[in-house]
Design a protein with these regions (language model features):
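Structural preference for solvent-exposed beta-strand-turn elements
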Residues: 1-180
């Protein structure tokens, strides 16, 4: 067994800035889809999943500018909803599990979202059922396309309701709250 020996009496000084957390960054970045105003986010981690989500948002028309180290502005004024139906969007969504977090904001603002069965990291049991059941309880309708293995999710008007999720899911909860 390994151990650390800590000797006291030595004054520490200085500052550190911890890297932003991936899952929180994915949620906050997707939340920028809820408004057409510019949003500035600091401490965005420079990691593959976050960078791929930023590229995906650019593809759908979000204006993204890097304004400093780990700091970006996002403006979702000109979203191209037609891009959601294209093969390129579906392919990119399938390789990025975090893309599922776009559903809530897109449903809330535009009444439409498309999602491919996402990939990404494979840690444990990572179902999307919690997200989908929550959206259905808010009034969204799902249509599965066998050919593209995608779901088109539509809602003319989402309506808040009491909800007890079938499993604990931080991203599911965040996604449902963004839709509500």
């Amino acid at each position: 067994m390994e151990s650390f020996i800590i000797e006291g009496g030595h004054m520490l000084s200085g500052t550190i800035t911890p890297q932003g957390a991936k899952n929180e960054a994915l949620e906050v970045i997707c939340a920028t889809l809820l408004t057409n105003e510019e949003v500035r986010i600091k401490n965005i981690p420079d990691i593959l999943d976050v960078n791929n989500l930023i590229l995906l948002l650019k593809d759908i028309g979000v204006e993204v500018n890097r304004v400093g180290k780990n700091e970006y502005t996002f403006c979702s004024k000109n979203i191209d909803l037609g891009y959601l139906d294209g093969e390129e969007f579906v392919r990119k969504c399938a390789s990025l599990r975090g893309s599922v977090l776009m559903i809530g904001p897109l449903l809330a603002r535009f009444g439409k979202a498309v999602v491919a069965k996402p990939g990404g990291d494979k840690i444990g049991r990572r179902r999307l059922d919690t997200h989908f059941l929550g959206f259905k309880k808010l009034g969204a309708k799902f249509v599965h396309s066998e050919g593209t293995n995608t779901f088109e999710i539509k809602a003319n008007r989402l309506k808040g309701t009491y909800m007890l999720l079938d499993e604990a899911s931080v991203t599911g909860t965040a996604n449902i709250i963004m839709a509500a």
